[in-house]
Amino acid sequence: MSISASLVKELRDLTGAGMMDCKTALAETNGDIEAAVDWLRAKGIAKADKKAGRTAAEGLVGVAASGNKAVVVEVNSETDFVARNDAFQDLVRKIAQAALSTDGSTEAVANANVDGKTVTETAKDAVATIGENIGFRRSAALTVPQGVVATYIHNGVADGLGKLGVLVAIETAGDAEAANAFGRQVAMHVAAINPLALTAEDVDPAAAEREKAIFIEQARESGKPDNIIEKMIEGRMRKFYEEVVLLSQAFVINPDLTVAAALKEAEKTIGAPAKITGFVRVALGEGIEKEETDFAAEVAAAAKG
């Protein structure tokens, strides 16, 4: 029988499944909507396996905090449209909450419990109702023995969910609310500037050597004496560290201060010494090579059957 576009749309609205899957389901069930819904549910696992090869570079980053610990997770989907889906957002929230009971490592979170199943299994099951390849990609956590771990979401679509998530750990015995407020400002800074490391000692030596090699080559081309070249390289490396090290960077909230100096100022409000002990920045789809899709071609393919 001929399957109308309106029938396909109705089934897609009901289930959130993909267009081609809806058309196949209706063809298999002679256009019976209820039977087609059941058919799609029955094929949920098979569909998840079939879709697993498709690139999931969209999705959401979620954060969750409890006491002196916070976590950030990334869950991918194939389209930004699905990232605005309530069911998908609920899934990311559940995964973030489940992550709080682990050490935050990607492996531990993948095996954490969500409604009686692992995070990996739960994400796979969601394919049947959401209609796209869904995948838990990565996670991280920060903890302090005393103090706070502030969180920040950039480009938020809902509370604790967005395209970029940041955690900043502040160790202090002072006022937690004041520490969290400052920590959030630092997290906003991290989101905007994307520092490479907390301190100069934390910078990857290989990255520093690469920069130094470039500076040496540039300095040699100047034709200046070796003693001048050496000072030029020292100056450029100093500037390099100022640009990539969080504590040495000009604070976005107040560029007249470095982040380290801003922390000293914040101690007055916090009421005790404070130390930034770590940060994590997770940007959605970072490092994923995204496929180019042609929606018009998808519609045309569906129309041809």
From Swiss-Prot:
Q: Source gene?
A: tsf
UniProt-annotated stretches for the region Involved in Mg(2+) ion dislocation from EF-Tu = 79-82
InterPro entries assigned: EF-Ts_dimer_sf, Transl_elong_EFTs/EF1B, Transl_elong_EFTs/EF1B_dimer, Transl_elong_Ts_CS, UBA-like_sf
Is Cytoplasm set as a keyword in this record? yes
Q: What name is this protein filed under?
A: Elongation factor Ts
Q: Which GO terms describe its cellular component?
A: cytoplasm
Q: Which CDD domains does this chain map to?
A: UBA_EF-Ts
> Which GO molecular function annotation, any one, does this entry have?
translation elongation factor activity
